[in-house]
UniProtKB/Swiss-Prot annotation:
Active site: 176
Species of origin: Citrifermentans bemidjiense (strain ATCC BAA-1014 / DSM 16622 / JCM 12645 / Bem) (Geobacter bemidjiensis)
The protein, known as: Malate dehydrogenase
GO MF term list: L-lactate dehydrogenase activity; L-malate dehydrogenase (NAD+) activity
HAMAP family in the cross-refs: Malate_dehydrog_3
Length: 317
């Protein structure tokens, strides 16, 4: 049985972590593309040389030629400028649109059968542009946002309640921006509603609501919080881990239910746009979109988030 092949477009901070994680999990052979000569070659050589230490055996290659991504089963795109303090994800749209156009053309020409996972910001616009230029079916072009946003939400809940993050279940919907929708009603710890636990902890419904609202606000601004602390870039460990989870579900046909930036065709009342929703990811990419009823408050937040996505995508044309 032939090994799977993962292509990484972009040799920056996220690309380096992606390569290391893909190797550690032995998801397949990995090739990293970047336009800077020597950068992907150096990073991949560095990772390859610890195969005997970390216990992995796969072929790792750095390249400046798109031809080397031929035969890739999954392509993960991180190429683009990162945020700097004070910038929103949307501020990157003009420059990163040009980069994404070039990247998508390279993928289309050299890896026409690949599944594509986009990480580049502004995410909702970049995944839309990537699909448009490649012309790939919608189920094969997706964006990573919700896995990370949900993971951040889970982390803050675990810290607040003093429980293992492994036992927290929570999810965000909508766009990857300030209007994302953390679903408070569905957040739980081993099936116990988080709001119930907060009310028990504080013995005050108003206080519990206030604490939850603070966690929701922090989740929405979590990426910016990292940017402000780093000062010279944006998050890279967490986006890479999140994208690898998505890639692994596709490569191993795991059927994981993961919040994914997927193209909607009427689900959640949205048609013709990429928005974060729970999806089943398997060997066919997006195999199902799990639709469920939102209450009035959730629907209003979702509508606001989708409106922001539409405005963002519209500004790209």
């Amino acid at each position: 049985m032939a090994r799977k092949k993962i292509a990484l477009i972009g040799g920056g901070q996220i690309g380096g972590v992606l390569a290391q994680l893909a190797a550690l999990r032995e998801l397949g052979d990995v090739v990293m593309f970047d336009i800077v000569e020597g950068l992907p070659q150096g990073k991949m050589l560095d990772i390859a040389e610890v195969g005997s230490v970390d216990g992995f055996d796969c072929n790792l290659k750095g390249t400046n030629s798109y031809e080397d991504i031929k035969g890739a089963d999954v392509v993960i795109v991180t190429a683009g400028l990162p945020r700097k303090p004070g910038m929103s994800r949307d501020d990157l749209i003009e420059v990163n649109s040009k980069i994404m156009t070039s990247v998508a053309e390279g993928i289309k020409a050299n890896a026409p059968n690949a599944f594509v996972i986009v990480i580049s910001n502004p995410l909702d616009a970049m995944v839309t542009l990537c699909q448009k230029i490649t012309g790939f079916p919608y189920n094969r072009v997706i964006g990573q946002a919700g896995v990370l946003d949900s993971a951040r939400f889970k982390t803050f809940i675990a810290w607040e309640l003093g429980v293992s993050v492994k036992d927290v279940n929570a999810m965000t919907l909508g766009g990857h921006g300030d209007d994302m929708v953390p679903l408070v009603r569905y957040a739980s710890v081993n099936g116990i509603p988080v709001m119930e636990l907060l009310e028990k902890k504080y013995k005050d419904k108003a206080k519990a609501k206030e604490v939850m609202e603070a966690m929701v606000k922090r989740t929405r601004g979590a990426g910016g919080e990292v940017v402000a602390l780093l000062k010279t870039g944006s998050a890279f460990y967490s986006p890479a881990s999140s994208a690898i989870q998505m890639a692994e579900s596709i490569l191993k046909d795991q059927k994981r239910v993961l919040p994914t930036c997927a193209h909607l065709n009427g689900e959640f009342g949205v048609k013709g746009f990429y928005v974060g929703v729970p999806c089943v990811l398997g060997e066919n990419g997006v195999e199902q979109i799990l639709e469920f009823e939102l209450d009035a408050e959730e629907q209003a937040m979702m509508d606001k988030s989708v409106a922001a996505v539409k405005e963002l995508v519209g500004s790209m044309k």
